[in-house]
Structure formats: C-alpha cells, structure tokens
Amino acid sequence: MKGTISHRESFLTHIRQQLGKDSSSSASIQRPAWKHQVQWETNGLLSKEELVEQLKMQCQRIHTRVVETTPEEAPSALRSLMTEYGEGSVMTSGDHRFEQYGFYPMFDSLQHEGFAVTSWNAEASREENIRLAEQAAYSVVFSDYTLAESGTIVLSSHQGQGRALHFLPMMYIVCIEKSTVVPRMIQAVSTLNRLVEEGEQAKGAIHFISGPSNSADIEMNLVVGVHGPVRAVYLLIDDE
C-alpha cells in the first residue's frame, strides 16, 4: 500500500528558512573544501614498486599468497598453482582479460584432461550459475583495483560475474594487473565515482574482498573458510 505525501514542499521550505538557507529547492549543493586531505596524503607518494611491496607484506597478514608473473607467463603460472594445490574444476568470470593474456588455450588443455572449465554465463539462470560455482574447486577472476594498504581487491558484480563466484569455490585466485594497484580505498572509490559522473553505466554491487574467509569466535580463535574460500592467491601480472 502506497502512502501520500502532503505539503512536502511547504514543510521543507519552512525548514530551509529556519536554517537561513535559500528557499529555492533548486539551489545547488556545494561540496565542502576540506583543509586537510589525509585520505589522499597517506601512502600517496609511494612508487608503484613500493606499493607492491606493501601489498605483499599485508597479504602475509591476511593469509593470502602473492605470485608474481609476466603477461606472457600468466597462464602457465595459473596452471602451476592448480598442479600445486590439486587439480579440479574451474569457474571464471566473463572477463575479456582472459583472452587478452592468453588464458583460453590453457583452459582448453584442462578440458582435454577431463577437468570442467566454465564461466559465469549471463544467458544461464541464476540457479545454474550458482550450481556450477558450488561444484568448482577454483574460482578465477580479475580485480579492477587492489588496495596495497589492506590487501583488498575491488571488483563489481555484473552479468558476467555474480557474487556467488567469489564465495562458493574452495580456492580463490585473483589475477591482479600491477597497473591497477593503488595505495588505499580513496583512490579506488574516487575513480569509480568519476567514471559514473562521466556517464559510464554503474555496475552492480561493488565488492571489497581481503583474502580468504576469516572468522573468529569470542575467544579470538581464527577459523578460515566458514563464509567463503579456504585459500586465496593473488596472481600479480606485471603489465607495466
């Protein structure tokens, strides 16, 4: 049942007048000019190499392994990780960068060896995508940005990448382009905000994921994998 709002404008005009504001509802709102910009200054002068070192140190604290590779060696590096951790089915996001870095021939060879390789399919039902994610041993995705300060990857849900892809498989492998590593959250969200202001269509939910699933009970006993992947590996691709 919908309600009806009566006298809204007169009510808001009265409040504006009492606050000494312009009574016109079309008066523009100006963003404040902050005297201090510590959110930008913190780690803002670090070089890319220094940010990568900070990222690797932070990943040790959040139980996440970082494997560095080149664009040419990225597919073989991923294959080596699967050999090390145990071969199994793979589900990827629908991302053009898998083709850009030459992952598809490696995925084809996995299928010839008898391992299922699927992608989050925008044409399939939600239930079917979730079923495949539940069965996958590996989730392989690309991050949009990575925060060096906290070891956090930033990515969005969209037609080729549902939320369940990041939480249901046991092993979570994130391909990170070195060029997308930023100091901290302010750089990532500011860029996302600017893109929307410039007219880019906003995607679905934005996810901030820091390593594998970590939980702790009241005694602070760490439990890994309760709400998501048991292991996380960041495959850092030097694209610069």
From Swiss-Prot:
Biological process terms in GO annotation: lactate metabolic process
Signal peptide: none
Pfam families attached to this UniProt entry: LUD_dom
Gene3D superfamilies: NagB/RpiA/CoA transferase-like
Transmembrane regions: none
Function comment: Is involved in L-lactate degradation and allows cells to grow with lactate as the sole carbon source.
Homology family: Belongs to the LutC/YkgG family.
Protein known as: Lactate utilization protein C
Origin species: Bacillus pumilus (strain SAFR-032)
Name of the gene: lutC
